[in-house]
Amino acid sequence: MTITIALPSKGRMKDDASAIFERAGMTITAVGNDRSYRGRVEGWDDVEVAFLSASEISRELGNGTVDFGVTGEDLMREGFAEVDKRVEFCARLGFGHADVVVAVPEIWLDVDTMADLGDVAADFRARHSRRLAIATKYWRLTQQFFSSQHGIQLYRIVESLGATEGAPAAGSADIIVDITSTGSTLRANHLKVLQDGVILHSQACLVRARKESHADEPVVQAIIDAVRAAL
């Protein structure tokens, strides 16, 4: 069978992923021209490469339409419920680091932890007759973190279609859940991350779709072993 590896199609993620595969003895070349969305691995005739966006890679992995992919852990865990039943996180690759965090306005001086925020959520309902509004693109991770892990129920999620960090200042939300690498954008918007408000330390991962056909396919384990040895 042919094994398909989905890799980022552009930017730093593409360069970093290609470098790791090259160290693993799996040099990747485009089929056709440099702007092609298909590729191959030199010396691995039963492996093909698809160049996709990070969000496309996570979707194709979750649906099982590719065998391997390099994408952010945040995209996989946000995109699918019980994601570990669908895919295996084979290796964390050491690039694409970013944290999914809970951030509140800096002027909330007495709110530093999720417990403090739980008190605020209850107070919002009592004082304003509405629930605390959270702007985010990460509704699944937000619900799991607030409701399942911290027992906070009195909130509502406002879907963020633009720059999430601007939502509190614009009045469309009270707080945010967003992804950040350095925190500089949050600080520029006068937001602070709660002390225990890191939902996920994300980075680029080699992810395998869980397929029965992989059990008897030696090239599957060979790919995993080669990448792990290159880290």
UniProtKB/Swiss-Prot annotation:
The yes or no answer to whether the keyword Amino-acid biosynthesis is present is: yes
Class of enzymatic activity (EC top level): transferase
| GO MF terms, alphabetically ordered | ATP binding; ATP phosphoribosyltransferase activity
Q: Which domain of life is it from?
A: Bacteria
Q: List the GO biological process terms.
A: L-histidine biosynthetic process
Describe the family membership recorded for this protein in Swiss-Prot or TrEMBL. Belongs to the ATP phosphoribosyltransferase family. Short subfamily.
Per the record, the domain comment is:
Lacks the C-terminal regulatory region which is replaced by HisZ.
Protein name per its UniProtKB record: ATP phosphoribosyltransferase
Q: Which gene carries the instructions for this protein?
A: hisG
